[in-house]
Amino acid sequence: MAEKLEVYKCELCGNIVEVLHGGAGELVCCGKPMNLLNENTVDAAKEKHVPVIEKTNDGIIVKVGSVAHPMEEKHFIQWIELIANGKAYRQHLSPGDKPEACFPLITGPLKVREYCNLHGLWSSEG
């Protein structure tokens, strides 16, 4: 059963999907079940993957890692997502970009997720 906002990946073709409405069915791609991506479970440098949330007067800045994450062709952050108050905001990144994103100022509890093409899904709350 897929739950709202879960992220799944096809290990054959690399498709990644986020569930917008949960349901009882199984997510399938390339004829095989997709894998649920669990946050913060890959054995990798946490200081380069756990998102850091910075609140400013102008908005929210999310930086990937307390030490900047590489943004190279073979190893980079594909996207950063902010979830708050029933809304999801996402910034897609490319190699060469800074590993950060700016979002509008939002009050209340925040959850931030990012996806590293080599080390998977990471999150933090603030």
Swiss-Prot record:
Is organized in two protein domains. The N-terminal domain has a fold similar to that of desulforedoxin and contains a mononuclear Fe(3+) ion, center I. The second domain contains a different mononuclear iron center, center II, with a Fe(2+) ion. This is Desulfoferrodoxin. It comes from Syntrophotalea carbinolica (strain DSM 2380 / NBRC 103641 / GraBd1). Catalyzes the one-electron reduction of superoxide anion radical to hydrogen peroxide at a nonheme ferrous iron center. Plays a fundamental role in case of oxidative stress via its superoxide detoxification activity. Gene3D superfamilies: Desulphoferrodoxin, N-terminal domain, SOR catalytic domain. Fe cation 1 binds at C10, C13, C29, C30. It is an enzyme of class 1 (oxidoreductase). Keywords: Detoxification, Electron transport, Iron, Metal-binding, Oxidoreductase, Transport. The gene is dfx. Belongs to the desulfoferrodoxin family.
